[in-house]
């Protein structure tokens, strides 16, 4: 199995390095990751400047100022030959649950892999300690995919409780929960009297029902949520069509 491994925490982050070490025991792994933390970069792609890369002695590649999406795009189309069999993103430091997936560079890297035609996993740890647990879970999933490919055309967003492996209760297929909108902004003043602003933490849980990713992780289960790139709200199609007809948009300007 050939694996392209990326993340949004940066090439030296403990999550990606722990996972790379575990994966290399049974797979051919190429790390292509940002040279610094790009958390929250979502699906951004660098279009107005060139991208430089640096290859470390162990073969890992850092993309200077690159986003997670840049890294997967370059990895698939230029840096990994032959091309990978699968794209894996993570292990993220902290969860990507519910609405987090909108902003997550970890999830975005997996989405880019799926967009380019490859199976893809995004893996996050609900904390900052037991990366070995998340690595073991990821290896188990990848061995399963090697034995029997999952032909859903979807990304698997995997969130792992920050627990020793022996304390993981099992695995659940979940849906994304949701949070209350985040509204906290933290102002500061620099030495010259200018106001600076920091974006605050995410909102509290709003929808954390039993079938959500929030609930699974809180209860000690690995959460696996299938995600797709198509953002079309198919169930709203007829409602929007009827509304356009009722307000006359398209018949008069």
UniProtKB/Swiss-Prot annotation:
Subcellular location: Cytoplasm
Coiled-coil segments: none
InterPro entries for the chain: SurE (IPR030048), SurE-like_Pase/nucleotidase (IPR002828), SurE-like_sf (IPR036523)
Gene3D superfamilies: Survival protein SurE-like phosphatase/nucleotidase
A Gene Ontology cellular-component term: cytoplasm
Catalytic activity: a ribonucleoside 5'-phosphate + H2O = a ribonucleoside + phosphate; a ribonucleoside 3'-phosphate + H2O = a ribonucleoside + phosphate; [phosphate](n) + H2O = [phosphate](n-1) + phosphate + H(+)
Essential cofactor(s): a divalent metal cation
Binding site for a divalent metal cation: 8-9, 39, 92
Domain of life: Bacteria
Function: Nucleotidase with a broad substrate specificity as it can dephosphorylate various ribo- and deoxyribonucleoside 5'-monophosphates and ribonucleoside 3'-monophosphates with highest affinity to 3'-AMP. Also hydrolyzes polyphosphate (exopolyphosphatase activity) with the preference for short-chain-length substrates (P20-25). Might be involved in the regulation of dNTP and NTP pools, and in the turnover of 3'-mononucleotides produced by numerous intracellular RNases (T1, T2, and F) during the degradation of various RNAs.
Recorded family membership: Belongs to the SurE nucleotidase family.
Protein name per UniProt: 5'/3'-nucleotidase SurE
């Amino acid at each position: 199995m050939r694996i392209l491994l990326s993340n949004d925490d940066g090439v030296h982050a403990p999550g990606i390095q722990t996972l790379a070490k575990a994966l290399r025991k049974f797979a051919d792994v190429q790390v292509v990751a940002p040279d610094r933390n790009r958390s929250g970069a979502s699906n951004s792609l660098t279009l107005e400047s060139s991208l430089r890369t640096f290859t470390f002695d162990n073969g890992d590649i850092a993309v200077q100022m690159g986003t997670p999406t840049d890294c997967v795009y370059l990895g698939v189309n230029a840096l990994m030959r032959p091309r990978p069999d699968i794209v894996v993103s993570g292990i993220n430091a902290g969860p990507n649950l519910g609405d987090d997936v909108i902003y997550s560079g970890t999830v975005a890297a997996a989405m880019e892999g799926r967009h380019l035609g490859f199976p893809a996993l995004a893996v996050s740890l609900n904390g900052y300690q037991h990366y070995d647990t998340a690595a073991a879970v990821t290896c188990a999933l990848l061995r399963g995919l090697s034995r029997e490919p999952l032909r859903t055309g979807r990304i698997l967003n995997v969130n792992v409780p920050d627990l020793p492996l022996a304390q993981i209760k099992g695995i659940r297929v979940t849906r994304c929960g949701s949070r209350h909108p985040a509204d906290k902004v933290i102002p500061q003043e620099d030495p010259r009297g200018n106001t600076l602003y920091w974006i605050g933490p995410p909102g509290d849980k709003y929808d954390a029902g039993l079938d959500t990713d929030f609930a699974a992780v809180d209860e000690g289960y690995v959460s696996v949520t299938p995600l797709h790139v198509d953002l079309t709200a198919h169930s709203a199609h007829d409602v929007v069509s009827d509304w356009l007809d009722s307000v006359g948009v398209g018949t008069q300007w």
